[in-house]
């Protein structure tokens, strides 16, 4: 009996159970194999850069934090760094250390969120809940240090907020909880790599080769999963990280497993950085804020940092009235999504959302641009 091939389109989203954030995925299929894919973003467009134009730098630092709830700290850190460099503002070393500690805690909770989401997409609910259970102590630590679990408001121009100063009496307890987190993470990693069902879904699936990754400018763990060194912390863009010993994690296979493995092992490196930072804090000067600064006019300057998903870029200048001009913000998800869109053809429909999830997309960070064609949005 002859069966005719089915050719058609499957539209997923913008709201779907496998999506943490809204986007629209169009899959053009032949039977159950993807022949072409189109990823549509922009559902959450809010025009952040336009809103920032003409505001004082103190206000845009608050606004930048609202760009994303998962990586809010890195946005504020980059934002205030532009003003600090443009106005030659000295930041106390203790403040820089605490900024880095909070960022690495944020990296841990973000990576654990991805693991939970990835297991959920795979259909392994038990592993998903385990990932979130391991993540919870990190959220509690962030809440204790900053007063918030999602919006931390830690960096300010010239330092950090007083409430975010880490008391030396709390350091031993924090180190103990980090050690427990590390033990639980090792168990989760061991359980993952030794489960043949999980590995069959993520090994040799969604392969992004090094050439394509370079061509489409993959960033962060997505690039490092394809053998590309891309960590801004190791490239001298964030001077405070020169005080810490840690490794840049790179895998060469470029598949879903490699992208997840980079994040797994990055968690151990983040714990290493936090541990060093906490142990060094008692030896640093007690100052956390430099109030003796003056805003001055400067042309747009560039600032880079390494967010959980890759390179974050901020640029703006101040006019003669101390108002922000020419704001540009670039987050890593846009180029990483282009990579995922390029490698979807040839895969089974059931692998589509998993492949996209493997680059850990943050659509809230990405949706700041809108396309206008013939005066129509």
Swiss-Prot record:
Gene3D superfamilies: Cytochrome-c3 Hydrogenase, chain B. GO terms for molecular function: ferredoxin hydrogenase activity; NAD binding; nickel cation binding; oxidoreductase activity, acting on NAD(P)H; quinone binding. The keyword Oxidoreductase applies. Disulfide bonds: none annotated. Keywords: Oxidoreductase. Belongs to the complex I 49 kDa subunit family. This is Uncharacterized protein MJ1027. It comes from Methanocaldococcus jannaschii (strain ATCC 43067 / DSM 2661 / JAL-1 / JCM 10045 / NBRC 100440) (Methanococcus jannaschii).
């Amino acid at each position: 009996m002859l069966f005719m091939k089915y050719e058609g389109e499957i539209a997923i989203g913008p709201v779907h159970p496998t999506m943490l954030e809204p986007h629209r995925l169009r899959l053009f299929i032949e039977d159950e194999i993807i022949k072409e894919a189109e990823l549509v973003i922009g559902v959450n467009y809010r025009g952040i850069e336009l809103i920032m134009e003409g505001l004082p730098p103190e206000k845009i630092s608050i606004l930048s934090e609202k760009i994303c709830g998962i990586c809010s700290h890195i946005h504020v850190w980059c934002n205030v760094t532009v003003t600090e460099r443009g106005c030659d503002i000295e930041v106390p070393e203790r403040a820089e250390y605490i900024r880095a500690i909070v960022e690495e805690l944020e990296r841990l909770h973000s990576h654990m969120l991805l693991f939970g989401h990835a297991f959920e997409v795979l259909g392994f609910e038990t592993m998903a809940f385990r990932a979130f259970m391991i993540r919870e102590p990190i959220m509690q630590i962030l809440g204790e240090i900053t007063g918030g679990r999602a919006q931390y408001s830690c960096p300010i121009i010239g330092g950090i907020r007083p409430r975010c100063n880490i008391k030396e009496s709390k350091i031993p307890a924090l180190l103990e909880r980090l050690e427990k987190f590390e033990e639980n993470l090792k168990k989760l990693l061991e359980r993952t790599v030794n489960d043949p069902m999980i590995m069959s879904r993520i090994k040799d699936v969604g392969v992004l080769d090094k050439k394509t990754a370079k061509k489409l400018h993959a960033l962060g763990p997505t690039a490092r999963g394809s053998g590309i060194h891309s960590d801004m912390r190791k490239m001298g863009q964030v001077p405070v990280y020169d005080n810490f010993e840690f490794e840049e994690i790179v895998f060469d296979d470029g598949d879903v497993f490699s992208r997840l493995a980079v994040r797994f092992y990055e968690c151990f490196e983040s714990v290493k950085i936090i541990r060093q930072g906490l142990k060094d804090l008692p030896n640093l000067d007690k100052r956390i804020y430099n109030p003796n600064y003056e805003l001055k006019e400067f042309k747009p300057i560039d600032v880079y940092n390494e967010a959980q998903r890759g390179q974050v870029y901020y640029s703006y200048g101040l006019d003669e009235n101390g108002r922000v001009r020419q704001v540009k913000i670039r987050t890593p998800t846009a180029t990483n999504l282009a990579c995922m869109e390029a490698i979807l053809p040839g895969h089974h429909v059931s692998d589509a959302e998993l492949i996209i999830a493997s680059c850990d997309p943050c659509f809230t960070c990405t949706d700041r641009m809108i396309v206008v064609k013939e005066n129509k949005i």
